[in-house]
């Protein structure tokens, strides 16, 4: 019942969808400016607004074998967790090495905006210290 009250308090199910779609838009804008990351699903019409999956397109990363790529992603994820800015954003275990960001309505748009520079920071920190 608390969850239903919360949904009502923010404006109903339409608002939930709006928040999630805006989170995806925030990530899209960030990806479009990035030189190192892309959407795993390249077809914009098929992308999930809740489970946003990203793959690394940087040549530096893609020269590694899959094991080294997973290790690199794990370092990025670990740095973000240590800074307490993101938890559990590693891609699915059976998916190619990737990041998976929850974009559902429980993540406020300002928090999603704040996350993007942190992901850049973690990636570049790992790359520059390799």
Please annotate each region the language model reported.
Residues 2-6, 26, 79, 114, ...:
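Alpha-helical scaffold segments in soluble metabolic enzymes
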Residues 93-130:
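PLP-dependent enzyme catalytic core of the Aspartate aminotransferase-like
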Residues 80-97:
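Short glycine/proline-rich, acidic loop/turn segments that cap or connect secondary-structure elements
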Residues 59-76, 107-114:
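Short, conserved charged micro-motifs
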Residues 3-25:
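Structural signature of PLP-dependent enzymes
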Residues 30-33, 75-85, 118-126:
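Generic non-transmembrane alpha-helical segments
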Residues 14-16, 28-61, 88-90:
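Conserved small-domain helix->loop->beta segment predominantly found in fold-type I
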């Amino acid at each position: 019942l608390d969850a239903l009250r919360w949904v009502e308090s923010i404006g109903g199910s339409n608002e939930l969808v709006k928040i999630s779609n805006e989170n995806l838009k925030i990530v899209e804008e960030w990806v479009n400016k990035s030189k190192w990351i892309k959407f795993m699903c390249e077809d914009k019409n098929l992308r999930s607004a809740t489970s946003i999956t990203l793959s690394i397109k940087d040549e530096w990363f893609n020269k590694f074998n899959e094991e080294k790529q997973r290790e690199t992603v794990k370092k990025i994820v670990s740095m973000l967790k240590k800074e307490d800015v993101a938890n559990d954003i590693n891609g699915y275990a059976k998916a190619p090495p990737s990041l998976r960001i929850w974009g559902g309505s429980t993540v406020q748009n300002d928090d999603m905006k704040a996350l993007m520079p942190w992901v850049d920071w973690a990636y570049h920190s790992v790359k520059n210290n390799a």
